[in-house]
A protein has these predicted regions:
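Glycine-rich phosphate-binding active-site loops on the catalytic face of alpha/beta enzymes
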Residues: 5-10, 108-133
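Short, well-ordered secondary-structure micro-motifs
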Residues: 14-15, 37-40, 64-69, 98-100, ...
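Surface-exposed amphipathic alpha-helices with a cationic face
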Residues: 19, 42-46, 77-83, 144-152
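Active-site/ligand-binding-proximal alpha/beta "capping" segment
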Residues: 44-111
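C-terminal helical cap(s) of enzyme catalytic domains, especially alpha/beta-barrels
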Residues: 123-156
Length: 162
């Protein structure tokens, strides 16, 4: 899967080229992009011939400074309502705080996210990038276990831990 980072969401030369590939594309929402702009960027890929597009909500820039970004869970639900595309939620970038990843992951699943993108590293303090917002392996296992009940309550088993 090829990932279009948030800052390249409206790089139309890149999107035009990616539309010609036969590889799945994860389109991250820009930090200041409206949902409509995000969906139109996805449409750019689709109309160029690539039907393998997934949307990724990774938080937006707001006035809040306590978190790296503000995870827009309404955008997850709205994208599901307005589009046929799968929606991925990235609570790592959406919060920038490992302590919030579990609760925001559960909220994203409740909002309709089809998948989660979570930063994990064996030793986050030594990670070359995104270490401050990464989970270590035991933390990741705990988050995954915490998803089992909400997934069952929603009547789905999307990647649910056993």
């Amino acid at each position: 899967m090829l990932q279009v980072g948030a800052r390249n969401m409206q790089n139309f030369a890149l999107l035009r080229r990616l539309a010609t590939t036969k590889k799945p594309i994860l389109l991250k929402r820009g930090p200041s992009a409206m949902v409509k702009e995000w969906l139109l960027a996805a449409e750019y890929l689709l109309s160029g011939g690539n039907g393998q597009v997934a949307l990724c909500e990774r938080g937006i820039k707001t006035f809040e400074t306590a978190t790296r970004n503000t995870m827009d869970l309404a955008a997850v639900a709205l994208a599901k309502e307005l589009s046929h595309l799968p929606v991925v939620a990235d609570p790592s970038h959406g919060t920038g705080k490992p302590s919030l990843i579990g609760s925001v992951s559960r909220a994203a699943i409740a909002a309709g996210a089809d998948a989660l993108l979570i930063e994990v590293h064996r030793c986050p303090e030594r990670a070359l990038s995104d270490g401050a917002q990464s989970l270590d392996l035991p933390q990741f296992e705990a988050v995954m276990q915490s998803l089992a009940l909400p997934l069952r309550a929603l009547g789905t088993s999307k990647g649910a831990p056993a």
